[in-house]
Swiss-Prot record:
Protein known as: Beta-glucosidase 7
Keyword Transferase found: no
Membrane-spanning residues: none
Family annotation (Pfam families): Glyco_hydro_1
Record organism: Arabidopsis thaliana
Enzyme class: hydrolase
Reactions accelerated catalytically: Hydrolysis of terminal, non-reducing beta-D-glucosyl residues with release of beta-D-glucose
Length: 502
């Protein structure tokens, strides 16, 4: 495999010249999907309505005082028709959303909730009626609390059977109208963030180091995710694929990576980071086993695939879902004092420290489009050029700061340019989804930060939506009225200047 470091020179060379080149929607393949994304807990609200049971995020967010939770969020459960109309007006070609396991199957297994089933059928029908392709994620961090309480969730192999049964219901009930299925969202980050720092969700307060074996649970959870994903994939291929003709995939959180210096130590550290952050999930999907460097580093802490499991995992993804926001320089300095407290044990295993390329605060981070281009080229060359969907990419800003979110429009423009470059250079990238369609309850920033192209007034009981400049830019790009090489973003800002305040 080519390490990430070998792409850095290529990416920097093209980034200086290519992102200002003209491109339009017509420069992408006809079947390429441009869309936007949300997730169930962050968008739906209605946390205890119509038979829904608590998820681990309901439990965890209720540890906070006041209304700092997703109980109502954007109220998408009641306002989905309004939101689909906004998508249609924008010209979205696809909408990515997740299905709440605890809304559809409240006990985690067994009885289907008819009102939950009807909601998702109606949402999919509404999307289809407006010519919008549903892209469905089965798991977006919101395990039914009942399964967490019963056996500990993803660290127990019982999750494989329960997740496969949940997927079976979804394929059976929605599969005629859904052709793109992502099994698990951000599998890498979910395992690291939920288990690697010992703060497992579904507890109030969340589990800490004294009650969780953080040295092993990250890798156990990741292993069980791969087995659950491959089990559900095998089910789909045997039972549904011939008739429904859909595709199934797994999503990873993909950091852009580059050596901090040209030293051998930093290049080697970057190779280790690539193995842990990409190869951990992607290599089993290609060859049926973990990267050698992970096996050498972790020893008995890394679970082992049986021969049968290896065969099942290999080839179990029709596509790779990429979630990308940040790019980092990698340096070989694993001293604990240099590693942030969150995820520190995982990065100690890597033996590396990640330094943000540009500003990377809670409310803002810089556009580093060469990072995404490098990711797409790396996956192409290291993992047999699989089909890729960029399932999330977007820019945070302080919520309620302005409707004229020019930095967000410029961010989206730059990253679409990076995708265009990667496709030109042979990447089989097939879709790009902005995070997010509207302002959401953010799992980290709560209501302080937002990514939406539509502003949501969370103080308004009606959750009024208002378009931002980025929504107008994306609309113009999709319908061909925005010339990316011109000053149209600036002109658009002037045109919208009369509605900049909230």
């Amino acid at each position: 495999m080519k390490p990430f470091s070998q792409f850095f020179v290529f990416v920097v060379t093209v980034s200086a010249t290519s992102y200002i080149d003209a491109f339009t929607r017509n420069d992408f393949p006809n079947d390429f999907l441009f869309g936007a994304a949300t997730s169930a807990y962050q968008w739906e609200g209605a946390f205890d309505e119509d038979g829904k049971s608590p998820s681990v995020w309901d439990t965890t967010s209720h540890c906070d005082s006041g209304s700092n939770n997703g109980d109502i969020a954007c109220d998408g459960y009641h306002k989905y028709k309004e939101d689909v109309m906004l998508m249609a007006e924008m010209g979205l070609e696809s909408f990515r959303f997740s299905i709440s396991w605890s809304r559809l199957i409240p006990n985690g297994r067994g009885r289907i909730n008819p009102k939950g089933l009807l909601f998702y059928k109606n949402l999919i029908k509404e999307l289809r009626s407006h010519g919008i392709e549903p892209q469905v994620t089965l798991y977006h961090y919101d395990l039914p609390q009942s399964l967490e309480d019963e056996y500990g969730g993803w660290i127990n192999r019982k999750i494989i059977e329960d997740f496969t049964a949940f997927a079976d219901v979804c394929f059976r009930e929605f599969g005629e109208d859904v052709k793109l299925w992502t099994k698990i969202n951000e599998a890498t980050l979910f395992a690291i963030g939920s288990y690697g720092d010992g703060m497992r969700y579904g507890h109030c307060p969340p589990m800490n180091y004294s009650t969780a074996n953080v040295c092993t649970e990250t890798y156990i959870a990741g292993h069980n995710m791969l087995l659950a994903h491959s089990s559900a994939s095998n089910l789909y291929k045997l039972k549904y694929k011939t008739k429904q003709r859909g595709s199934v995939g797994l999503s990873i959180y993909a950091y852009g990576l580059s050596p901090y210096t040209d030293s051998k130590d930093d290049e080697t550290a970057t190779e280790r980071a690539e193995a842990f952050l990409f190869g951990w999930m992607l290599k089993p999907l290609v060859v049926g086993d973990y990267p050698d460097i992970m096996k050498r580093t972790l020893g008995s802490r890394l679970p082992v695939f049986s021969e049968e499991e290896s065969k099942q995992v290999k080839g179990s993804s029709d596509f790779v879902g990429v979630v990308h926001y940040n790019t980092f320089y990698v340096t070989n300095r694993p001293a604990p004092s240099l590693v942030t407290s969150i995820n520190k044990l995982f990065f100690a295993d890597i033996g590396a420290y990640l330094i943000a390329a540009g500003n990377a605060s809670l409310f803002e981070f810089d556009a580093v489009p060469w990072g995404l281009e490098g990711i797409l080229q790396h996956i192409k060359q290291s993992y047999n050029n699989p089909p890729i969907y960029i399932l999330e990419n977007g820019k945070p800003m302080k919520h309620g700061s302005t409707l004229q979110d020019t930095p967000r429009a410029e961010f989206i423009q730059a990253y679409i340019g990076a995708v265009h470059n990667a496709i030109t250079n042979g990447s089989d990238t097939r879709g790009y989804f902005v995070w997010s369609m509207i302002d959401l309850y953010e799992l980290i920033g709560r209501y302080m930060t937002s990514y939406g192209m539509y502003y949501v007034n969370f103080s308004d009981p009606g959750r009024k939506r208002s378009p931002k400049l980025s929504a107008s830019w994306y609309t113009g790009f999709l319908n061909g009225t925005i010339d990316v090489a011109s000053q149209d973003t600036i002109q658009l800002q002037r045109k919208c200047s009369g509605s900049s305040s909230l």
